[in-house]
């Protein structure tokens, strides 16, 4: 939901961050850089399981488009610096991550923490645990509604996110496949890549079109 609602923020801030980090890494002679992208860079209708060479072959998912374009730009920036200046900037595309200190903000969170929080709030409502609902909203208000607001206001805002005492609505058709990875395992993989993988290992020698993906 956040990708679609805050489209300008997503593309503007991500492009700014990437340009600053990659550009300053080059300016200061950083020997190796790991750029983390996103699986949303691949086309909406890409054949499953997705192949890396599906990138830029057809339209992106519209709701993720600004974020995806920013991530593609970062990947191509790393690739272009490598080809022009001989840098060693590696781009990897993690799947959906979850783990400690995750973001449970219903307006901005990713799919798994959003599902967990929705189910938690739905369970509290179903069991009549109003204190549990209020504690949750005091910790993370939704659209400015916290646990001190009226019951009517709270129920109304939760209903907008598909949360009620008798059901929890998870958005989507139910057809897409999702893959999740524990964040600490991604951290281990990132360390391994930095220690054992270089840009030259990401393509076959003799390739005329070199891709950093």
Residue ranges and their predicted role:
Residues 20-23, 62-95, 111-133:
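Active-site Tyr-X1-5-Lys
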Residues 1-14:
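NAD(P)H-binding glycine-rich loop region in Rossmannoid oxidoreductase-like domains
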Residues 1-2, 42-44, 99-100:
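Short catalytic/ligand-binding loop motif for oxyanion handling, primarily in non-cytosolic enzymes
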Residues 11, 15, 54, 59, ...:
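Short-chain dehydrogenase/reductase
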Residues 16-65, 90, 103:
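Conserved Rossmann-fold NAD(P)-dependent oxidoreductase catalytic core, especially the SDR/UDP-sugar
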Residues 83, 97, 113-170, 178-212:
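Alpha-helical substrate-binding/gating segment
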Residues 38-39, 53-55, 75, 94-101, ...:
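Active-site pre-Tyr helix/loop in NAD(P)-dependent dehydrogenases
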Residues 15, 19-23, 76, 184-187, ...:
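Conserved active-site region of classical short-chain dehydrogenase/reductase
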């Amino acid at each position: 939901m956040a990708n679609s609602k805050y489209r300008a923020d997503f593309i503007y801030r991500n492009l700014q961050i990437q340009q600053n980090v990659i550009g300053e890494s080059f300016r200061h002679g950083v020997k190796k850089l790991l750029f983390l992208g996103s699986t949303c860079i691949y086309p909406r209708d890409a054949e499953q399981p997705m192949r890396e060479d599906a990138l830029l072959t057809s339209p992106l998912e519209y709701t993720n488009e600004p974020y995806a374009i920013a991530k593609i730009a970062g990947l191509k920036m790393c690739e272009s610096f490598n080809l022009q200046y001989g840098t060693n900037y590696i781009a990897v595309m993690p799947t959906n991550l979850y783990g400690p200190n995750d973001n449970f903000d219903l307006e901005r969170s990713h799919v798994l923490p959003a599902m967990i929080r929705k189910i938690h709030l739905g369970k509290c409502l179903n069991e009549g645990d109003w204190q549990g609902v209020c504690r949750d909203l005091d910790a993370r208000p939704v659209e400015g509604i916290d646990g001190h607001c009226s019951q009517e206001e709270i129920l109304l805002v939760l209903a907008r996110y598909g949360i009620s005492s008798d059901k929890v609505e998870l958005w989507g058709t139910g057809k897409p496949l999702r893959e999740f990875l524990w964040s600490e395992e991604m951290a281990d993989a990132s360390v391994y890549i930095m220690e054992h993988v270089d840009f030259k290992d990401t393509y076959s020698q003799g390739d005329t079109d070199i891709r950093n993906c």
